[in-house]
Amino acid sequence: MGQLTTFDLTNWIEIYNLKMYFETGTGEGVSLSHAASYEFDQLFSVDIDGDLIDSSKQKFIENKKINLLHNYSVEAISEILPTLDKDKNILFFLDAHFPGADFNKISYEESLRQFGKNSIPLQEELATIMSLRDVSNDVFIIDDLMLYEEGDFEYIRQGGIWKHKELQKELNLITESNFIYDMFKDTHECIKDFRHQGYLIITPKKGN
């Protein structure tokens, strides 16, 4: 589980004229708090864990720019994106993996079994986003890249192991990264960041 705090967003906001922030996976509000320190017009954060949403509502009660959504990420995307100004570029931080598990409410195995495709919703999130808006000027940061491909990830170097690949196969929840690169090959550049469990930073190609 990484955090948006890993990144200084200033250059991306300026270069790509980013006006809104949308994250999947509120967690304890750490990444949202970081995003809120920048001058976004609006910020959206979605989590299926009602307790985490309620906690963040209290934490950010004074910030009227922040919108907290208790829902599955794909459903929230489908609900909110059509209401947003299509001319305002968005920074997406996609981190809605394994509901309940990162905060020790349930195990990762239980999360995979209980939530199924909603435990690893990235492909459906991206497909839904791209069906609802022209993303050619939007920026995406995808967390937990190590779930989707091999690499020299900091988490692995420090002895971390993802133990549930066989369970993913059993549940037909296999993850790979080809779909990401295929989706963005015409419009964006993809840069890998191997800190923590890995990030994929997806920025518009020049001339978009």
PLM regions: where:
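A short alpha-helical cap/connector motif
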Residues: 1-91, 97-208
